[in-house]
């Protein structure tokens, strides 16, 4: 009668007598590990294999058969690792390794997001409703007067930049700089009165999308005419006088003696 050979004492040291165990410890005999890893030599659809031996051992048939059954179970449980491990295979493991967590901001820094935003600008000239043009009067002042012929070259060319502000259907925030000059119209408080001035700026920092509020004007179009309301001082407007050759100023009245309506002429770059 054929008998199942008993395992050598080296292997039996790792054997478990419990039929439900996997029978061998992780650090078992090296030759057994190799036989499990080389699955090409052990097809998964194979059954229990018995070896015939002429030698007799003191161990019982039941123990030896249990070990063989355990080996067969292990063969079928092990899955060979593919030869090439692709990078996209890592995505399979990420949900088990990392846990997604939302990021909350206590404050929202608009400056960080608009600092590098491009600024859209156009070049233009302005005339009040009486067709007076705006020209330089000294280094930091504008005045309004009628120009004709070659004198039209004296009128100021503005670089109108579309900036961040309280934009609505009838109001567009803009900044008014003088073309090729480091000067911008700004509104400040002098002697407790809102005042229009020309302010010198650093050309490395201006224009920018988020201008300081004193530089911002709300451009309002009414009946093909334009008004420029100060964002710093609501209901105060860029104004001219009825008289000739008078300074451009910031006025707090509309429809009276002060002129707050302008027309805009585009100028090629």
UniProtKB/Swiss-Prot annotation:
CDD domains: beta-trefoil_IL1B. Residues 1-116 form a propeptide. Changing residue 181 to E: Suppression of integrin binding. Markedly reduced activity. One of its GO terms (biological process) is extrinsic apoptotic signaling pathway in absence of ligand. Expressed in activated monocytes/macrophages (at protein level). GO terms for cellular component: cytosol; extracellular region; extracellular space; lysosome; secretory granule. Keywords: Cytokine, Cytoplasm, Inflammatory response, Lysosome, Mitogen, Pyrogen, Secreted. The keyword Secreted applies. It is found in: Cytoplasm, Cytosol; Secreted; Lysosome; Secreted, Extracellular exosome. Its main location: cytoplasm. Pfam families: IL1 (PF00340), IL1_propep (PF02394). Activation of the IL1B precursor involves a CASP1-catalyzed proteolytic cleavage. Processing and secretion are temporarily associated. Gene3D superfamilies: 2.80.10.50. The keyword Disulfide bond does not apply. (Microbial infection) Cleavage by S.pyogenes cysteine protease SpeB promotes its activation independently of CASP1. SpeB-mediated maturation of IL1B plays a dual role depending on infection site: while IL1B inflammatory response prevents bacterial growth during invasive skin infections, it promotes streptococcal infection of the nasopharynx by disrupting colonization resistance mediated by the microbiota. One of its GO terms (molecular function) is cytokine activity. A motif (Involved in interaction with TMED10 C-terminus) lies at residues 228-241. SUPFAM superfamilies: Cytokine. Induction: By LPS. Transcription and translation induced by M.tuberculosis and a number of different M.tuberculosis components in macrophages; EsxA is the most potent activator tested (at protein level). In pancreatic islets, release is increased by high glucose treatment. In pancreatic islets and macrophages, release is also increased by endocannabinoid anandamide/AEA. The record marks 171, 179, 181, 190, 204 as: Important for interaction with integrin. The record marks 120 as: Involved in receptor binding. Monomer. In its precursor form, weakly interacts with full-length MEFV; the mature cytokine does not interact at all. Interacts with integrins ITGAV:ITGBV and ITGA5:ITGB1; integrin-binding is required for IL1B signaling. Interacts with cargo receptor TMED10; the interaction is direct and is required for the secretion of IL1B mature form. Interacts with HSP90AB1; the interaction facilitates cargo translocation into the ERGIC. Interacts with HSP90B1; the interaction facilitates cargo translocation into the ERGIC. Potent pro-inflammatory cytokine. Initially discovered as the major endogenous pyrogen, induces prostaglandin synthesis, neutrophil influx and activation, T-cell activation and cytokine production, B-cell activation and antibody production, and fibroblast proliferation and collagen production. Promotes Th17 differentiation of T-cells. Synergizes with IL12/interleukin-12 to induce IFNG synthesis from T-helper 1 (Th1) cells. Plays a role in angiogenesis by inducing VEGF production synergistically with TNF and IL6. Belongs to the IL-1 family. The IL1B production occurs in 2 steps, each being controlled by different stimuli. First, inflammatory signals, such as LPS, stimulate the synthesis and promote the accumulation of cytosolic stores of pro-IL1B (priming). Then additional signals are required for inflammasome assembly, leading to CASP1 activation, pro-IL1B processing and eventually secretion of the active cytokine. IL1B processing and secretion are temporarily associated. This is Interleukin-1 beta. The lineage of its organism: Eukaryota, Metazoa, Chordata, Craniata, Vertebrata.
